[in-house]
Amino acid sequence: MSILEINNLHVSIEGKEILKGVNLTLKTGEVAAIMGPNGTGKSTLSAAIMGNPNYEVTQGQILLDGVNILDLEVDERARLGLFLAMQYPSEIPGITNAEFMRAAMNADKADEDKISVRDFITKLDEKMALLGMKEEMAERYLNEGFSGGEKKRNEILQLLMLEPKFALLDEIDSGLDIDALKVVSKGVNEMRGKDFGAMIITHYQRLLNYITPDLVHVMMDGRIVLSGDAALATRLEKEGYAGIAQDLGIEYKEES
């Protein structure tokens, strides 16, 4: 079992503190949902874990299996088994989907251990079929001209191909219709097992109808203020964040 620990994490952007002491433990074999209103620091948390240089960690630790990874670059964290599926994936012309994924899969392997072209194609075909993706997607430039739904499927395809220890899934349900949501959820559920853990960031309970979390954490004002099991997401759907905030004595303004 691998463990990702976030201890008293404070993160700022351009001098403004966004995370104000986050404590969280993620384990392989578990799926945790991070829920909360917009602007409470959910995406900042995933970016900080992955090492985005635009986010300054001013206090705290991020430990992967007991080792502090704060001084590691993004690519080094990825090679240790961290994966981030972004809400708005970048378009990268000049490199195809297939080229990108094979390079990523082989990045941390010795020459004798690199995946062969045959094995790569076999695995790629299998995972693309699972997600209902056309074969031509493999030869298109990375995310270039992709629709929002295609980009989200492509992020999950990368997840299935790379098989990381921990996936940070940042609002992968954003902008998806119900059919695309089911496909994306199917891909995430395919990964579930003792060697895989996920942190799913979402604003709504809808995604969790298809990916049942083991744990649910509620973020408000840069902190995790409440934790529970999947029933907590259902409670949020009924009461809203205002109801939770009132119960906890937290000041909360409804979004306009």
Curated annotation (Swiss-Prot):
Annotated source species: Streptococcus pyogenes serotype M18 (strain MGAS8232)
Protein localization: Cell membrane
Keywords: ATP-binding, Cell membrane, Membrane, Nucleotide-binding, Transport
InterPro entries documented for this protein: AAA+_ATPase, ABC_transporter-like_ATP-bd, ABC_transporter-like_CS, FeS-cluster_ATPase_SufC, P-loop_NTPase
SUPFAM superfamilies: P-loop containing nucleoside triphosphate hydrolases
Molecular function terms from GO: ATP binding; ATP hydrolysis activity
Disulfide bonds: none
Residue stretches making up the ABC transporter domain: 4-246
One GO CC term, this protein: plasma membrane
Binding site for ATP: G36, P37, N38, G39, T40, G41, K42, S43
Coiled-coil region list: none
Pfam family, one: ABC_tran
Family of this protein: Belongs to the ABC transporter superfamily. Ycf16 family.
Topology of this chain in the membrane: Peripheral membrane protein
Protein name: Probable ABC transporter ATP-binding protein spyM18_0273
CDD domains xref list: ABC_FeS_Assembly (cd03217)
